């Protein structure tokens, strides 16, 4: 069974003088507890260009996104950092989209037909279902180049080893095996990079590399906090500020997984 969460658009906004402008604002509608919540994203760029961009996007067909359903709460997005990366990209591009939540423990036949390996995320682009977050985000960047989220090649791998070292530390049963130090080493390197080049990986503007790394840092924070009683040291102030900044972005808040789901999602690796 899949649950559909649909994005909507608002064609006009009121000006200070009480008139309406033609600026189209994209919004995502959620239903929680019988209430309808409308969330509006922030936008970047000059006002006329932004207005034209959003007007065009508002009339576009919503992208179809298959995502993991929550393990703990019905009709809620689940814990997949790769899916959140894709959703963050779509949000930052101000594109409308429909999410189809899939119970990965009981994969329906329709889902297995479009994703034979049974993996998420998978997005419908140009009438084709596309898998793998790397491929999906690159395809979205090419099809919708504005606003640009491209990360320069020389910066694209910044922070890329943090996730694997986090997993190594999380799974470790030996406090002296060096896995914690390996993670701290990667975080320290990233902190130094942000100090000299931040606040984001590509400087002043957020880019694809941030949208890939941030969901993984969120999982790191929740999972290590729960299973290891561990947190990023205060001495790594630039990393902590980076996480706080991105975690508070509208697009991140709208696509975030519940802490309970992150904890449940990592439990098999910890207990295995």
UniProtKB/Swiss-Prot annotation:
L-ascorbate binds at residues 68, 79, 269. Monomer. Involved in ascorbate homeostasis. Maintains redox pools of ascorbate by recycling dihydroascorbate (DHA) to ascorbate. Involved in scavenging reactive oxygen species (ROS) under oxidative stresses. InterPro entries: DHAR1/2/3/4, Glutathione-S-Trfase_C-like, Glutathione-S-Trfase_C_sf, Glutathione_S-Trfase, Glutathione_S-Trfase_N, Thioredoxin-like_sf. One of its GO terms (cellular component) is chloroplast. The keyword Transit peptide applies. This is Probable glutathione S-transferase DHAR2, chloroplastic. Belongs to the GST superfamily. DHAR family. Glutathione binds at residues 68, 79, 107, 120, 133, 219, 266. Pfam families: GST_C_2 (PF13410), GST_N_2 (PF13409). Residues 1-57 form a transit peptide. Its main location: plastid. Induction: Down-regulated during senescence. Residues 70-148 form the GST N-terminal domain. Residues 126-272 form the GST C-terminal domain. The active site is at 80 (nucleophile). GO terms for molecular function: glutathione dehydrogenase (ascorbate) activity; glutathione transferase activity. It comes from Oryza sativa subsp. japonica. The gene is DHAR2. It is found in: Plastid, Chloroplast.
């Amino acid at each position: 069974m899949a649950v559909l969460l649909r994005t909507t658009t608002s064609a006009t906004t009121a000006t200070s003088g009480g008139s309406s402008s033609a600026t189209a604002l994209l919004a995502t509608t959620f239903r929680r507890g019988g209430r309808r919540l409308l969330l509006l994203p922030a936008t970047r760029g000059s006002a006329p260009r932004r207005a034209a961009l959003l007007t065009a996007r508002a009339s576009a067909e919503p992208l179809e996104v298959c995502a993991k359903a929550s393990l703990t709460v019905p009709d809620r997005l689940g814990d997949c950092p790769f899916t959140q990366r894709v959703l963050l990209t779509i949000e930052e591009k101000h594109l409308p989209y429909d999410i189809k939540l899939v119970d990965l423990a009981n994969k329906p036949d329709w889902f297995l037909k479009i994703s034979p390996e049974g993996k998420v995320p998978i997005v419908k682009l140009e009438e084709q279902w596309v898998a793998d977050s790397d491929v999906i985000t690159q395809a979205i960047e090419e099809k919708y180049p504005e606003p640009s989220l491209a990360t320069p090649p020389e910066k694209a791998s910044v922070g890329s080893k943090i996730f694997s070292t986090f997993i190594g530390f999380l799974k470790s049963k030996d406090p002296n095996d060096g896995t914690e130090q390996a993670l701290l080493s990667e975080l320290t390197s990233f902190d130094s990079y942000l100090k000299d080049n931040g606040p984001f990986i590509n400087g002043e503007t957020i880019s694809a590399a941030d949208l890939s790394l941030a969901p993984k840092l969120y999982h790191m924070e929740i999972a290590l906090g729960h299973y290891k009683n561990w947190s990023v040291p205060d001495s790594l102030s630039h990393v902590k500020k980076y996480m706080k900044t991105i975690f508070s972005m509208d697009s991140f808040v709208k696509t975030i997984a519940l802490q309970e789901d992150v904890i449940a999602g990592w439990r098999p690796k910890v207990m295995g």
